[in-house]
């Protein structure tokens, strides 16, 4: 069951859901909380390899990922960051979100942005129970024109769903959790998987 606005506000007040900085109640709709774009980005750079071989050794895969991923790009609030047609860019929410072990979060991009060709969260929209940190966004510009985004703008919304019980292995207690406590646009750590 998804939490309604009243239950979201109650969970924020009681501290079972933590969003920092705490959102104003005006950005809590009937079923979700608006999230804003943060200041950290990473882009994919050109690479001489014809493809990314996910079956290669962990060391080789890690080396290739590091070579195609830019260093962190920090953009000041209100300044534009351009995403060009066909470009995949990582960003992060301005807010840090912490969930208890009995709630799962779901992140959706804004419909108004999708109608311009911008996919805000390409596939990984589930926020696991026990999650704590910024939420990395996988932007893809499927439109025909570059799109200028500005840190601080509303980029999406998160809603919360109660589970049938508390998770035995929430994200914050898993030894193999690759993105614990992230605060910036962290690139793929697929080479760290078993």
From Swiss-Prot:
| Molecular function terms, GO-annotated | dCTP deaminase activity; nucleotide binding
Task: Keyword check for Oxidoreductase, yes or no.
Answer: no
* The protein's enzyme class: hydrolase
Locations of Polar residues compositional bias?
Answer: 182-194
Q: Where is the active site?
A: 138
User: What are the GO BP annotations of this UniProt entry?
Assistant: dUMP biosynthetic process; dUTP biosynthetic process; nucleobase-containing small molecule interconversion
- Keywords noted in UniProt: Hydrolase, Nucleotide metabolism, Nucleotide-binding
Annotated region described as Disordered, given as residue ranges: 169-194
- Bias class Basic and acidic residues marks the residues at 170-181
The record lists the catalysed reaction(s) as:
dCTP + H2O + H(+) = dUTP + NH4(+)
The record's InterPro entries line, in alphabetical order, gives: dCTP_deaminase, dUTPase-like_sf, dUTPase_trimeric
One Pfam family, short name: DCD
Q: In which pathway does it act?
A: Pyrimidine metabolism; dUMP biosynthesis; dUMP from dCTP (dUTP route): step 1/2
Q: What is its EC number?
A: 3.5.4.13
Give binding positions for dCTP.
110-115, 128, 136-138, 171, 178, 182
Report the sequence similarity comment from the record: Belongs to the dCTP deaminase family.
Task of the protein: Catalyzes the deamination of dCTP to dUTP.
* Complex formation: Homotrimer.
Query: What is this protein's record name?
Result: dCTP deaminase
The record's gene field reads dcd
């Amino acid at each position: 069951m998804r939490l309604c606005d009243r239950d979201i506000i109650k969970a924020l007040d009681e501290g079972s859901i933590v969003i920092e900085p705490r959102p104003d109640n005006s950005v809590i709709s009937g079923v979700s909380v608006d999230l804003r774009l943060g200041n950290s980005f990473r882009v994919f750079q050109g690479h001489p390899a014809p493809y990314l071989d996910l079956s290669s050794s962990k060391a080789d895969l890690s080396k290739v990922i590091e070579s195609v991923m830019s260093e962190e790009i920090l953009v000041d609030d209100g300044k534009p960051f351009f995403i060009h047609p066909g470009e995949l860019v990582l960003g992060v929410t301005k807010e840090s979100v912490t969930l208890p072990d009995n709630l799962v979060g779901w992140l959706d991009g804004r419909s108004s942005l999708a109608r311009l060709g911008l996919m805000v969260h390409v596939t990984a929209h589930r926020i696991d129970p026990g999650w704590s940190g910024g939420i990395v966004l996988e932007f893809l510009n499927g439109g025909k024109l570059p799109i200028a985004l500005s840190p601080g703008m509303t980029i999406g919304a998160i809603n919360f769903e109660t589970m049938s019980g508390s998770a035995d292995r929430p994200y914050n207690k898993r030894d193999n959790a690759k993105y614990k406590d992230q605060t910036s646009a962290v690139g793929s750590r697929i080479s760290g998987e078993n």
